[in-house]
UniProtKB/Swiss-Prot annotation:
GO terms for molecular function: DNA binding. Belongs to the CSM3 family. It holds the Pfam family Swi3. GO terms for cellular component: chromatin; cytoplasm; nucleus; replication fork protection complex. Disulfide bonds: none annotated. Residues 221-242 have a biased composition (Polar residues). This is TIMELESS-interacting protein.
Length: 290
């Protein structure tokens, strides 16, 4: 302690003859010997010199819309052209220029809705190139044939079919017997027509066959008669002439009977005609024998 002197003043020590205190040197920066957090600042300062690798930013790539075949046959593509000109009014003859302007205006509106990035001229060129694709051609065929393309078309067609089926069911329930009777009448008329045509063909065919057989037999009989005339007596000639006449009658009757027997509707008439012909033949034979 410093002793107080007179007049309230203290005697200051003599610092000139006192040796300086020796302090240990400072440890290097960021060394484990330093307990305080002062080493963090030099680290940051030293790290500024070296380049630190920065992770790349993730960029989200957006799908750029393209005018391809799938987009052209979509809901706003070619199927929408069926309804583009529903409200369009054309003036007709004498106003061709105005009608063409309205047509192009509606087409431009359709093209802008489908793909607004392209101009109308470029859009037309692109659509012309896409017209060779198979998908586009099938879509155009379905439009021309009025076939369903979109899901809405399928749903509307199914609804119409169900409604029609409901009406058909009620109609068939009410008019079941009428339709059956009408169908049976039509079937009977068609079958009768076909039968009559077949019968006519059979009759003509049988007639031709009978005539051919008759001519062949007549020729053979005439030749045999010519040979027998030089040998046989006149009585035999008369008997042969009668036999040839009978054979001709029998051939004619047989041909006629065949024609009648071939037709199913004339079976009864054919049997009666056969009986009459047989009776006539028997009568002629009895007359010749007497």
């Amino acid at each position: 302690m410093l002793e107080p002197q007179e007049n309230g003043l203290t005697d200051l020590p003599d610092y000139e003859h006192i040796e300086d205190e020796t302090f240990p040197p400072f440890p290097p920066p960021a060394s484990p010997g330093r307990e305080d957090g002062e080493g963090a600042e030099p680290e940051e300062e030293s790290g500024r010199g070296a380049p630190v690798p920065v992770p790349p930013k993730r960029t989200v790539k957006r799908n750029i819309p393209k005018l391809n075949a799938e987009r052209l046959i979509s809901e706003r593509g070619l199927p929408a052209l069926r309804h583009v000109f529903e409200k369009a009014k054309f003036k007709g003859k004498g106003h061709e220029a105005e009608d063409l302007k309205t047509l192009i205006r509606h087409m431009e509106h359709w093209a802008h809705r489908l793909f607004p990035k392209l101009q109308f001229e470029d859009f037309i060129d692109r659509v012309e190139c896409l017209g060779n694709k198979k998908e586009v051609q099938t879509c155009l065929k379905r439009i021309r044939l009025d076939l369903p393309i979109l899901h809405e078309d399928f749903v509307s067609n199914n609804d119409e079919v169900e409604e029609n089926n409901g009406h058909d069911v009620t109609a068939t329930e009410l008019d079941h017997f009428l339709t059956n009777s009408y169908g049976s009448v039509e079937f009977a008329s068609e079958s009768s027509r076909s039968l009559t045509e077949e019968e006519q063909q059979r009759i003509e065919r049988n007639k031709q066959l009978a005539l051919e057989r008759r001519q062949a037999k007549l020729l053979s009989n005439s030749q045999s008669l010519g040979n027998d005339l030089s040998v046989n007596t006149p009585s035999t000639q008369t008997s042969e002439a009668g036999s040839t006449g009978e054979e001709q009658k029998e051939e004619e009757s047989n041909g006629f009977n065949k024609d009648l027997l071939d037709s199913p509707h004339n079976a009864g008439a054919a049997s009666t005609v056969n009986e009459e012909e047989q009776l006539k033949v028997e009568e002629t034979q009895l007359d010749q024998s007497f």
